[in-house]
Amino acid sequence: MRNVQDQPLVSPTEPMIDPFGRAVTYLRVSVTDRCDFRCTYCMAEHMTFLPKKDLLTLEELDRLCSVFIEKGVRKLRLTGGEPLVRKNIMHLIGNLSRHLKSGALDELTLTTNGSQLARFAGELADCGVRRINVSLDTLNPEKFRTITRWGDLSRVLEGIDAAQKAAIHVKINAVALKDFNDAEIPELIRWAHGRGMDVTLIETMPMGEIEFDRTDQYLPLSQVRADLASQFTLADIPYRTGGPARYVTISETGGRLGFITPMTYNFCESCNRVRLTCTGMLYMCLGQNDDADLRKALRESESDEHLSQAIDEAISRKPKGHDFIIDREHNRPSVARHMSLTGG
């Protein structure tokens, strides 16, 4: 087994540039397709998860991430599924933190449902994790259990408290769902801003299994913003985090609110990211099915040059934009794979 602390990386190369002149500096890595929740817009209730043999080992994930960092990635986000349910995940995070210490990586972060944060917040902070996103769509315990199918809201809130006590900045991600949580969004904003947390609202995306009621729950954020403007004073700001969100400040709370609108506003012109699955498939776009098998390149050779070439070939196919559209007539997703596999 390669020593991840001592293994030399590939020789420095020019930053990765896609066919449309966009620098790829952000890698999102789904470390597992498993989750302890079953959120209705993310996965089916009775999911069949990948067998262990199909997953990249933690050492392989480290090697892949390290090559991407050598090729110009400055921000690394671990996702899932739920990343903190992957066995020995802190070993991987601890190893990856060496890139923060060397200055090769600007940020190591993760998106989580919060269920495991009370257990891991201190270790995450010790590894240099300074910011995390927590997915939280409602503060109503009954609705929370409905949308997550299995989730316990109190456990998530305990996790958020633990993260903040560990000096980790928490941002709340909420999917806006028509006739489910739309009336609660102002309350969620006040609650989060009152605790020093930004909020980002997200439109539901047509990925994976789409049930009839889910299609009907699509809520354009343009409508949400108009509703919020009747209660709050919103001011556009140029704040950016390297992602697709457009931000406003809310005068009444003093906090920031982001909008991610893949369905009503195409943010592709500034896309700086690619997504790696736990099986080693690289997706150049969340809303396209084109992929590259990096597991094959990873296991064919100990040479990182071979892996680097496979990454370059994949980046050369990064598309101009996504294909998201909700097909109400046929009730089918525009992208068949589940968000839990691609990484939310």
Curated annotation (Swiss-Prot):
Documented EC number(s): 4.1.99.22
Protein's GO biological process: Mo-molybdopterin cofactor biosynthetic process
Listed InterPro entries: Aldolase_TIM, Elp3/MiaA/NifB-like_rSAM, MoaA, MoaA_NifB_PqqE_Fe-S-bd_CS, MoaA_twitch, MoCo_biosynth_MoaA/MoaC, rSAM
Binding-site residues for [4Fe-4S] cluster 2, renumbered to this chain: 268, 271, 285
Enzyme class, UniProt record, top EC level: lyase
Residues annotated for GTP binding in this entry: 28, 77, 111, 171, 273-275
Function summary: Catalyzes the cyclization of GTP to (8S)-3',8-cyclo-7,8-dihydroguanosine 5'-triphosphate.
Cited PANTHER family: MOLYBDENUM COFACTOR BIOSYNTHESIS PROTEIN 1 (PTHR22960:SF0), MOLYBDOPTERIN COFACTOR SYNTHESIS PROTEIN A (PTHR22960)
Annotated protein name in UniProt: GTP 3',8-cyclase
Organism annotation: Brucella abortus (strain 2308)
Name of the encoding gene: moaA
